[in-house]
């Protein structure tokens, strides 16, 4: 009897961690954008604000007339679906974002805004369809990283694929 109990407990202990390995804690946004915009010094704070306002005004609201305030003309793009250069980015953007009122906050569900030196990374929630069940979704993270040079966005990376 004891052997069977120990065998059952051992089997449970072996199966339970494996099942937990496939469990996921949902990724959630941080609602406090003012906290996210705080930097360790004046430079990182300014760089965070530059990227945040670019995202809010140009990317989300589609106000491309403000792009020269935020983006270098020779902007470098590492997303494989968008060409280099500010003009190429704007051509890409205007194909799917039409100008709309500028909101006071970024609408992207931000998890974090990280800044180190000339680099700023937006970390956000990404909700995707569950490949095993089309009626469900799951959350994961997405990132957009920017390099700032001369107070403008000079370069961008993300996880996009072709």
What is each model feature region?
Residues 51, 89, 115-126:
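A short hydrophobic beta-strand element
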Residues 106-109, 123, 137-143:
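Short, surface-exposed coil-to-beta transition loops
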Residues 8-18:
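Bacterial N-terminal signal peptides
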Residues 64-69, 73-116, 135:
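A solvent-exposed, acidic/Ser-Thr-rich amphipathic alpha-helical stretch
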Residues 113-120, 147-153:
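A short, structured loop/turn motif at beta-sheet edges
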Residues 139-162:
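Short beta-strand edge/turn micro-motifs at domain boundaries
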Residues 1-9:
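Bacterial N-terminal signal peptides that target proteins for export
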Residues 22-65, 69:
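Short, low-complexity N-terminal intrinsically disordered segments enriched in polar/charged residues
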């Amino acid at each position: 009897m004891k052997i069977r109990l120990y065998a059952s407990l051992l089997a449970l202990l072996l199966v339970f961690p494996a099942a937990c390995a496939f469990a996921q804690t949902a990724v959630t946004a941080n609602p406090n954008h003012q906290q996210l915009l705080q930097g360790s010094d004046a430079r990182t704070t300014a760089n965070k604000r530059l990227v945040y306002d670019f995202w809010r005004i140009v990317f989300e609201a589609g106000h491309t007339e403000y792009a020269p305030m935020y983006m270098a003309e020779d902007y470098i793009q590492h997303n494989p679906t968008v060409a280099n250069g500010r003009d190429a980015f704007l051509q890409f953007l205007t194909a799917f974002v039409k100008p709309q009122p500028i909101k006071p906050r970024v609408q992207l569900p931000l998890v974090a805004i990280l800044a180190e030196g000339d680099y700023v990374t937006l970390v956000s929630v990404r909700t995707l369809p569950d490949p095993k069940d089309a009626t469900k979704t799951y959350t994961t993270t997405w990132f957009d990283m920017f390099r700032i040079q001369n107070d403008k966005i000079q370069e961008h990376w993300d996880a996009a694929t072709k």
